[in-house]
Amino acid sequence: MAKMQSKMQSEKPDDGMREKMIAVNRVTKVVKGGRIMGFAALAVVGDGDGRIGMGKGKSKEVPVAVQKAMEEARRKMIKVTLKNGTLQHTVTGKHGASSVLMLPAKEGTGVIAGGPMRAIFEVMGVTNVVAKSTGSTNPYNMVRATLEGLAKMNTPSEIAAKRGKSVEEILG
């Protein structure tokens, strides 16, 4: 185990990524001989310029679970195109019983979002956004709903290409 911990500390990636822990849960497996305790961690990683990833890790110790979550988040990153530090347009996301509504905001508004959504926007590099979550506040479902909504977002050039029009026609 000491070898694993020294490996974790020596391989701390310095890739300019921002990391945020969302949740750490203690989980229990009941067996014939008693209870086996473990930990489940949920984390998000972003580059501050629109790339974001979510990961979850499980282990008998918290630091190992957190490390696994961070590594998975780095592997599963998606790219979201931002517009001057905010979103392109209003977007909604849903996962399970969690629903989120995300609206672009003017300069100086800040990040108006709660819980896991705030952490996502901070690591992603969004500086002005208004977000509201309804339904379940389970952190895992809220993160998945937020990422699903962000993945659905389109730039004006993508919409113009789909419709076979110019960007000027789309923007009016």
Curated annotation (Swiss-Prot):
Gene3D superfamilies assigned to the protein according to its UniProt record, in alphabetical order: 3.30.160.20, 3.30.230.10
InterPro entries: Ribosomal_Su5_D2-typ_SF, Ribosomal_uS5, Ribosomal_uS5_bac-type, Ribosomal_uS5_C, Ribosomal_uS5_N, Ribosomal_uS5_N_CS, Ribsml_uS5_D2-typ_fold_subgr
One MF annotation (Gene Ontology) recorded for this entry: rRNA binding
Pfam families documented for this protein: Ribosomal_S5, Ribosomal_S5_C
Keywords: Ribonucleoprotein, Ribosomal protein, RNA-binding, rRNA-binding
Tagged with keyword Membrane: no
GO cellular component terms attached to this protein's record: small ribosomal subunit
GO biological process: translation
Keyword rRNA-binding attached: yes
Residue span, S5 DRBM domain: 17-80
UniProt subunit comment: Part of the 30S ribosomal subunit. Contacts proteins S4 and S8.
Protein purpose: With S4 and S12 plays an important role in translational accuracy. Located at the back of the 30S subunit body where it stabilizes the conformation of the head with respect to the body.
Family the UniProt entry places it in: Belongs to the universal ribosomal protein uS5 family.
Comment text on domains: The N-terminal domain interacts with the head of the 30S subunit; the C-terminal domain interacts with the body and contacts protein S4. The interaction surface between S4 and S5 is involved in control of translational fidelity.
Name listed for the protein in its UniProt record: Small ribosomal subunit protein uS5
Source species of the chain: Herminiimonas arsenicoxydans
Lineage of the organism: Bacteria, Pseudomonadati, Pseudomonadota, Betaproteobacteria, Burkholderiales
